[in-house]
């Protein structure tokens, strides 16, 4: 019996980007073939590299080292948990006696509960707490930045977090990674509703309810047992806004997440949509193309998605046995 592909359907109604013509186009775009500075901002570059983690580590270490050598302030916006990165950077800082005294750290986003109460860094449910455990506490005491240089989220500073960053002259660098539907951390169209790109780019820090896909995704993290324990993931988050990303002097995006225990790169399509879809509020990741920076992509994410052909397992077994009999 012959099969055909006449079955059509629309994207799930809750998904922010609905243009099927664009979706069908970008899914076939080759990340590797579009490497380089081929985007709206000539200072934005797309690069496929074998060890994205290493590029992240080297970039952050070098910026901290220069802030020490030149005795200049360095303001960074960090995603967390990035424990492997934190450990590697700290090992180098300790080895070469590099001081972080001039470094100010802000966090891309943090968990909050249904009441809008922000997880304190001492909580096992805090993203920024991982920075303290795997970076600050492991750094030699004489090399540490003052605790007041670590700008934690609180319930009181949700609306003013962007102002705190701006008061220090904006971020010198922001590090990000894409989430589902081309979101940037907890920045997605639902939490940042805007009619125009211009309006979207002016939006600052706030309390949001992440997309359901983000809750499911986070349930696969080590801090939640890599188990799919959806009910154990805090339901809300506080996050910086597009305004803070665009005000940074440089933007480094890293795409190297794979599923726990597997090689399925869930960032493939979000990256394709961000790189090749329209720049608009419904496609948050696309705004990085307007900014100076680099998007580092691991080979697993850069490899096009694939669907294995369907087949009748009994027919396949019969074919194998027939070949064996003819040997």
Regions found by a protein language model. Name each.
Residues 2-22, 31, 36-56, 240-327:
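ATP/nucleoside-binding phosphotransfer catalytic cores, i.e., glycine-rich phosphate-binding loops
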Residues 18-44, 53-57, 98-175, 232, ...:
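Ligand-binding beta-strand-loop-alpha-helix segment within the catalytic cores
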Residues 59-72, 245-246:
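Glycine-rich phosphate/diphosphate-binding loops that line cofactor/substrate pockets in enzymes
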Residues 230-239, 279:
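A general structural motif
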């Amino acid at each position: 019996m012959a099969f055909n592909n006449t079955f059509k359907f629309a994207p799930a109604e809750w998904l922010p980007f609905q243009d099927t013509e664009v979706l069908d186009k970008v899914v076939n775009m080759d990340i590797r073939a579009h490497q380089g500075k081929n985007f709206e901002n000539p200072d934005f570059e797309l690069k496929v590299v074998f060890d994205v983690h290493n590029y992240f580590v080297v970039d952050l270490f070098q910026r901290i080292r220069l802030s020490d050598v030149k005795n200049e302030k360095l303001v960074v916006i960090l995603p967390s948990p990035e424990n492997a990165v934190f450990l590697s950077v700290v090992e180098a800082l300790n080895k070469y006696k590099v001081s972080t005294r001039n470094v100010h750290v802000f966090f891309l986003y943090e968990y909050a509960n249904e009441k809008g109460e922000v997880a304190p860094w001492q909580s096992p449910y805090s993203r920024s707490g991982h920075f303290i455990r795997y970076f600050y506490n492991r750094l030699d005491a004489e090399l540490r930045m003052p605790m007041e240089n670590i700008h934690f989220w609180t319930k009181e500073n949700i609306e003013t977090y962007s102002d705190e960053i701006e008061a220090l002259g904006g971020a010198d660098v922001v590090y990000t990674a894409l989430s589902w539907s081309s979101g940037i951390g907890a920045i997605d169209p639902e939490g940042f509703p805007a009619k125009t790109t211009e309006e979207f780019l002016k939006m600052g820090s706030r309390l949001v309810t992440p997309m359901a896909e983000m809750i499911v995704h986070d349930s696969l993290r080590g801090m939640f047992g890599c188990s799919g324990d959806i009910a154990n993931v805090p339901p809300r988050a506080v996050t910086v806004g597009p305004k803070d990303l665009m005000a940074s002097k440089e933007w480094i995006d890293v795409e190297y997440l794979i599923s726990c225990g597997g090689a399925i790169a869930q960032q493939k399509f979000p990256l394709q949509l961000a790189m090749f879809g329209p720049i608009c509020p419904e496609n948050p990741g696309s705004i990085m193309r307007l900014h100076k920076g680099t998007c580092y992509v691991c080979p697993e994410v850069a490899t096009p998605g694939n669907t294995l052909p369907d087949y009748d397992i009994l027919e396949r077994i019969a074919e194998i046995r027939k070949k064996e009999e003819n040997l």
